Amino acid sequence: MAAAAAKAAVVLPRPVTFVTGNAKKLEEVKAIIGNSIPFKSLKLDLPELQGEPEDISKEKARLAALQVDGPVLVEDTCLCFNALKGLPGPYIKWFLEKLGHEGLNNLLMAYEDKSAYALCAFSFSRGPGAEPLTFLGKTPGKIVPARGPTDFGWDPVFQPDGYDQTYAEMAKEEKNKISHRYKSLALVKSHFKEAGYVFQTDDGTI
């Protein structure tokens, strides 16, 4: 029985490639994943895609797997304003670059509803040709005037429900227990644990 299970195991090159060029994002992923998934980071030039978050994340995983020729993990992050029916959503990066933190607040100036949610979509592909699996994490909150350090995206303007601090004001350990990224990665970790992947090195499997 054990031999049959071993034969059925999916063998992956070690480590998995996490595609990012963002040092802060990499720092958070390392803190959340720990040693549970062997991975390395790599910055790739992937096309900027449009569509729904899950579709964008999956397509990025397909493209990255082709470039890396191996297993990859990619992430797409959204900040969605309920008053704007989900915008900026996956386009938050460009909204932030053009408008800044104050501009993001100004988008909601005419609305009483300041509620929003942070959404993280991690997609994992075992390699070229494999259908990516996507894991979604969502944290509800609201948009507030910027507070805290301004060195990590829109963190200063997002205050999660149940807290009086913005993401930027929170201790890293606290944020990493409740964030959209944490929730998505918790599902990734569960998948890897359940799948029982075997990682292969040049010297054989471990």
Swiss-Prot record:
Swiss-Prot/TrEMBL cofactor(s): Mg(2+); Mn(2+)
GO cellular component terms listed in the entry, alphabetical order: cytoplasm
InterPro entries: ITPase, ITPase-like_fam, RdgB/HAM1
Subcellular location as annotated: Cytoplasm
Statement: the UniProt record of this protein carries the keyword Magnesium: yes
CDD domains reported for this sequence: HAM1
Catalytic activity of the protein: ITP + H2O = IMP + diphosphate + H(+); dITP + H2O = dIMP + diphosphate + H(+); XTP + H2O = XMP + diphosphate + H(+)
Amino acids binding ITP: 20-25, 60, 76-77, 93, 152-155, 175, 180-181
Gene3D superfamilies: 3.90.950.10
Protein residues bound to Mg(2+): E48
GO molecular function: dITP diphosphatase activity; ITP diphosphatase activity; metal ion binding; nucleotide binding; XTP diphosphatase activity
Annotated cofactor note: Binds 1 divalent metal cation per subunit; can use either Mg(2+) or Mn(2+).
PANTHER family: INOSINE TRIPHOSPHATE PYROPHOSPHATASE (PTHR11067:SF9), INOSINE TRIPHOSPHATE PYROPHOSPHATASE/HAM1 PROTEIN (PTHR11067)
HAMAP family documented for this protein: HAM1_NTPase
Protein name in the entry: Inosine triphosphate pyrophosphatase
Organism of derivation: Arabidopsis thaliana
Organismal lineage: Eukaryota, Viridiplantae, Streptophyta, Embryophyta, Tracheophyta
